[in-house]
Curated annotation (Swiss-Prot):
It comes from the Eukaryota. This is Histone H2B.3. Keywords: Acetylation, Chromosome, DNA-binding, Isopeptide bond, Methylation, Nucleosome core, Nucleus, Ubl conjugation. Disulfide bonds: none annotated. The modification N6-acetyllysine is found at residues 7, 12, 28, 33, 39-40. Coiled coil: none annotated.
Amino acid sequence: MAPKAGKKPAEKKPAEKAPAEEEKVAEKAPAEKKPKAGKKLPKEAVTGGVEKKKKRVKKSTETYKIYIFKVLKQVHPDIGISSKAMGIMNSFINDIFEKLAQEASKLARYNKKPTITSREIQTAVRLVLPGELAKHAVSEGTKAVTKFTSS
């Protein structure tokens, strides 16, 4: 029990020194405010963030949505299309174009030619698209090419 009594006076002594330490801490507090005054770094970071926002440019994604809508209005003026269906149609057209481009590039390689001409595209259309769809696509394609060359 004697050690307990010894601890109590020891605890009181630091408590008595605490006000003196608080004065020292209070004296040091203005010295610590200097780094607080140096908080210009976050403000600079904010202005740097604003500059980064100015540098950010929307990534332009090319879609066929406008053209799909125009064709829909030509065929069925009274019918609309949902955004989900429009996305499906857009991905469908991208897939078809990719298949046609791959087939046309294969044909150009087989014939050892460095360029893809309208002939390779026409043959690729006949190979990729089935039956009547290929015939209609070829006729529309030749019509578009003749219109382009005549103008």
